[in-house]
Regions:
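Intrinsic-disorder/low-complexity detector
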Residues: 1-56, 346, 350, 354-370, ...
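Extended, charge-enriched "interface" segments that sit outside catalytic cores
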Residues: 27, 343-501
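Short helix-loop boundary/capping segments at the starts of domains
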Residues: 5, 19, 23, 99, ...
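C-terminal catalytic/motor cores of large multi-domain enzyme assemblies
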Residues: 9, 42, 52-349, 353-356
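Hydrophobic/aromatic-lined pockets within catalytic cores
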Residues: 18, 133, 155, 368, ...
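Short, hydrophobic/aromatic alpha-helical segments in well-folded domains
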Residues: 219, 363, 504-508
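Structured alpha-helical segments in the cores of large, soluble enzyme domains
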Residues: 94-99, 118, 190-191, 282, ...
């Protein structure tokens, strides 16, 4: 045995054992570094020495022979039935998309991102669509309003409408486009389940009012879905808009096509991720707003990051009602009342200030007294009517209070109502198409009689009542036609808009 295999502290122990065995059993083996090769020799027999008594040495247990384990089973091959891949040639619009995307790789781009609170956008869009549904019909989408804000921002910042090109000598030039040709990314599903992306544009979009832009937008989308677009609809796009937020995408960095200045991406309308688990009641109490993420991907050869950042800031300014943005939309759509205004949530100390409940009672009283002054009673003319005593800000109320529930003191037959419902009933009762003035009466019973019938909300007539009204109108029209044909040349007075009095008399 080689003592060099163990720690030197063990060497004296092994030397003692060697001496006890007479030096015959465990001669120290020199280390390989010091050992020299020796010639083979037959060792001489040493005389037997008397063996000293030694302690019995415990023998090591003999390991049982290992039982051979069975060979692992060969795993079954993961095979599928043989099938051929389907190869579809890209033709027509699909091939054009490939060409456009490959060309976009030659455009050096950068992207600016901005999160915008969408509370005011949601409130004013809701007010617009409710009015349109009750009058001439139609619907305004979020993309309509955001797209119009983008167009106004580009018109205010011409530096965002600059494209890159080369002159006849091959030298780079910056093209300051005279008009904003606003492209709209339209996703068109096909019968086979595939989808096609087309980006037609609205020429000279900066010259359009919101109503004109709304009509042009709807027309180009309709023609796109019906396959009626022409080459001219795609030519000359300078700035385009894509809205993947409609399918839940929060943030998008789209490709910028060659020849365009910028493409604006619109994300999903959602609460921030950290607040999505909160209840609606807590969200309302805390004054949390949904946000919308806007991205501006631009040609970095002619547009710089600071300009893109200022551009998105201006878009946010418009979406928060800056420069009478929503007032212009309401006027273009001939909506007779003012839009909702942006304001920070107003916290009121009930111990030292008039509570919001008392302020709401003041607002209700103001509508009863002055509401008839804002009623839209002129069916042939248009005027946006307002009264300072009917504005929320006069009472320290904001758009953040609209969904909060307050005691009403019995208004509308309810003890507690959201401020939104209170305002809707007040507007319907006093500021709609019917003007009612009765607060001059000194008789409280008379005032209570009007309030009970006006402030509970209108009840829509059922189908039978609607058919009865229609039948009465048809009878009146038929009778007038009879008089016109029976008594020719006779002087008489026609209904001339007095038809609405007929169902009123019938109900009485």
């Amino acid at each position: 045995k080689d003592k060099n295999l163990v720690d030197p502290s063990w060497w004296p122990i092994f030397e003692t054992i060697d001496k006890a065995l007479g030096g015959a059993g465990t001669a120290s083996t020199p280390s390989p570094a010091a050992a020299a090769p020796a010639a083979p020799a037959t060792p001489a027999a040493a005389p037997a020495a008397p063996a000293a008594p030694t302690a019995p040495v415990a023998s090591k247990p003999t390991k049982a022979p290992a039982t051979p384990s069975p060979a692992p089973a060969t795993p079954k091959a993961n095979t599928v039935e043989p099938a051929e891949d389907k190869i579809v040639p890209l033709r027509g619009p699909a091939k054009a998309v490939v060409t456009t995307m490959e060309e976009s790789l030659t455009v050096p781009t950068a992207t600016t991102v901005r999160a915008v609170p969408a509370k005011l956008l949601i409130e004013n869009r809701s007010a617009i669509n409710k009015y349109l549904a009750s009058t001439r019909g139609g619907k305004v989408s979020f993309t309509h309003i955001i797209g119009y804000a983008v167009i106004r921002a580009v018109a205010a910042m011409p530096s965002m409408n600059v494209t890159y090109n080369v002159d006849e000598k091959g030298k780079p030039v910056a093209v300051h486009n005279a008009h904003v040709n606003f492209g709209l990314a339209i996703d068109i599903p096909r019968p086979d389940g595939s989808r096609n992306l087309v980006v037609p544009n609205i020429k000279g979009a900066e010259q359009l009012s919101f109503r004109e832009f709304w009509d042009a937008y709807n027309d180009i989308v309709k023609r796109g879905r019906n396959g009626a677009l022409t080459i001219e609809d795609f030519r000359g796009t300078t700035v385009s808009l894509t809205n993947p937020g409609g399918i839940g995408t929060v943030h998008s960095v789209p490709r910028l096509s060659k020849g365009q200045a910028a493409i604006i991406g619109v994300g999903a309308l959602e609460y921030p991720a950290e607040f999505r688990g909160l209840s609606e009641k807590l969200i309302t109490q805390q004054g949390l707003s949904k946000i919308i993420t806007l991205t501006s991907t631009y040609d970095h050869r002619v547009i710089q990051g600071a300009g893109s950042g200022e551009f998105l800031k201006l878009v946010e300014h418009y979406l928060l009602g800056g420069d009478d943005f929503y007032d212009a939309i309401f006027r273009d759509l001939r909506i007779p009342f003012e839009p909702v205004r942006w304001a920070r949530d107003n916290h009121i100390d009930d111990e030292h200030e008039i509570s919001k409940v008392a302020r709401i009672q003041q607002l209700i009283h103001a509508y009863r007294v002055h509401g008839h002054l804002t009623a839209a009673t002129n069916p042939v003319g248009y005027k946006m009517r307002s009264h300072p005593d009917l504005k929320l800000e006069r009472y320290g109320l904001t758009l953040w209070d609209l969904d909060r529930v307050y005691p009403t003191g019995g208004f509308g037959g309810a003890e507690r109502l959201p401020l939104r419902t209170i305002l809707e009933r007040l507007h319907e009762a006093y500021s709609g198409s019917l003007a009612v003035e009765y607060m001059y009466s000194e008789d409280p019973e008379v005032r209570a009689w009007f309030q009970e019938r006006l402030e509970h909300g209108a009840t829509k007539p059922n189908r039978e009542e609607q058919l009865r009204v229609l039948s009465k109108l048809v009878e009146a029209e038929a009778f007038e036609h009879f008089l016109q044909t029976k008594y020719l040349g006779q002087k008489r007075f026609s209904l001339e808009g007095g038809e609405s009095l007929i169902p009123l008399l019938d109900a009485v």
